[in-house]
Amino acid sequence: MLTAEKLCVERQGHRILSDVSVEISPGQVVAVLGANGAGKSTLLQCLSGDVSEAKQHVFLNGKNLDSYTSQALAMARAVMPQSVQMDFAFLVSELVEMGLWQIPRQSDKQQRVDEALALFGIETLKQRDYQTLSGGEQQRVQLARVVAQLLTPIAQADAPRYLLLDECTANLDFAHQHQVFEVVKKLANTYQMGVVVVLHDMNLAAQYADHLVLLKQGKVLDQGSVESMLIPSKIEELYDFPVQVLPHPKGWPMIVPA
């Protein structure tokens, strides 16, 4: 389990997060929703171990983040930040392989790379120069890179693993957004990964998430199931914007402007 207890983060005298507590279970997709500046990315950074003052308040599989070496942490969780800048020319296969230092045999590394590329339907990009790809292609390659880091079969995994994604569908068209979230659900269901994803698209969250965290001005406004969170009163309080919630033909809520 990945948990945060009463997270408080200040930067330059400004409170970014106040008493934020969340819990992510293996096999669960948790979406963090909120307006710009709500603290969503900072929360993800805290959960990943990138905010030093928050480490004592975050626990991964029962252990405080402070007790993990960087190598052990890399094998237990993988992080995709909001933007990734690559200034050097790498082949796609080389980039995806970067997180696989713990695998000694090159043939095993290549098998893991191929598996990750196949998940996102980008096998044909394997020998392409990353810098020649479109923004959407680069986004899917970065997703393959972080997912490859955790693709140990569940029977061989020492402990549950966690995937932390910040706006992972940026630059992706409609079809690829849904393809990515189908992969996310597969990772949660088949590999029993816990997934935390920061999102702006409430309809993607409604369709694919198991649990929602509503963050407003650095505080948890509420959290719970999709059905209990995506109701007009809560959404309007979260975004200060009127909405309607309609039933999708397949059962999940669908949010439109009022």
Swiss-Prot record:
Q: Please name the top-level EC class of this enzyme.
A: translocase
**According to the UniProt entry, what is the EC number of this protein?**
7.6.2.-
Described function = Part of the ABC transporter complex HmuTUV involved in hemin import. Responsible for energy coupling to the transport system.
Disulfide partners: none
Give the CC-aspect GO terms: plasma membrane
**Which terms are listed as keywords in the entry?**
ATP-binding, Cell inner membrane, Cell membrane, Membrane, Nucleotide-binding, Translocase, Transport
| Protein's UniProt name | Hemin import ATP-binding protein HmuV
Binding annotation for ATP: 34-41
Mostly located where? membrane
| A GO molecular function held by the record | ATP binding
Q: Which one Pfam family would you cite for this protein? A: ABC_tran
**Entry keyword annotation includes Thylakoid:** no
Query: Does the keyword Zinc belong to this entry?
Result: no
Under SUPFAM superfamilies, the record lists: P-loop containing nucleoside triphosphate hydrolases (SSF52540)
Coiled coil located at which positions? none
Q: What gene name is listed for this protein?
A: hmuV
- Note the superkingdom of the native organism: Bacteria
Quaternary data: The complex is composed of two ATP-binding proteins (HmuV), two transmembrane proteins (HmuU) and a solute-binding protein (HmuT).
For this protein, the record's CDD domains field holds: ABC_Iron-Siderophores_B12_Hemin
Q: Which family does it belong to?
A: Belongs to the ABC transporter superfamily. Heme (hemin) importer (TC 3.A.1.14.5) family.
Q: Which residues form the ABC transporter domain?
A: 2-242
Q: Where in the cell is it found?
A: Cell inner membrane
Give the bilayer topology.
Answer: Peripheral membrane protein
Q: Which PROSITE patterns match?
A: ABC_TRANSPORTER_1, ABC_TRANSPORTER_2, HMUV
